[in-house]
Amino acid sequence: MGLTLAMAGKGGVGKTTLSALTIEWLVARGESPVLAVDADSNANLHEALGVAYEATVGGIREAARSEVPGLQGMAKQEFLDLRVQAALVEEAGYDLIVMGRPEGRGCYCFANNALRDVLDRLSRQYRHIVVDSEAGLEHISRRTLLRLDYLLIVSDASVRGVRTARRVADLADEVALPAGSRGLIVNRVPEAGLSETLRREVEATGLPLLATIPLDPAIAAMDADGMTVRALPPDAPARRALSGLLERLYEGRESASQAMPTYDNPRGTNDTR
């Protein structure tokens, strides 16, 4: 069973760390190759993984507007194929591609359509795909990226974060996001757990609560020192909590129809709005 999932949420809730830990979890299980996609315009997944990148899909899109019109036929597609392949950061067990900033002014129809074809072919070479997405779902909603099996919306343990998660879910509905199932992860939960106020906010999202990830001092120390997720101990509470969720998703112990509402019924039956 392959996983194609995206972590989405407002900046600062820890979705990039969770994305990096997910990639590491898959590689550690021998589930390579994995494609890591940084779809946040403020790219920092590479830092969490401890790698560097030189080119972005956004840069390729800009180059396509200026350079491709002078090419003919297959040369256009070959140009984009070569550029995307060159943009891949190849690591042990996974490759990383950085989407970069959204398009600027002007017509990008050809570039987007051609890139979509290139990325679709590229994605078929991988067993699993993990997308680190910003709350605006820019690259996913524009169909620059493929259909998702899971949209995992990440919040921190704050009312503002959970309300943003709800808006992300609303946006996913508005743009008919190509995601099979979705759910909520509340990150950085204190030892006392979720307050009653926060529980009510979670219920109001209409999203199933898939997991709570504990506030982990080891992650705070890791971030403070600029270290990568490899520095997080195997028994770190946050790592163990996320691993438990990934096990359930990967092994199919929760069927998508029972664990998370499908796109046809994204809010489930309890949403009365």
Describe these PLM feature segments.
Residues 4, 36, 94-96, 209-212:
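Conserved beta-strand scaffold positions in the cores of enzyme catalytic domains, especially
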Residues 78-86, 90, 95-133:
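Cytosolic-facing regulatory segments adjacent to core modules
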Residues 3-41:
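Walker A/P-loop phosphate-binding motif and the immediately C-terminal alpha-helix
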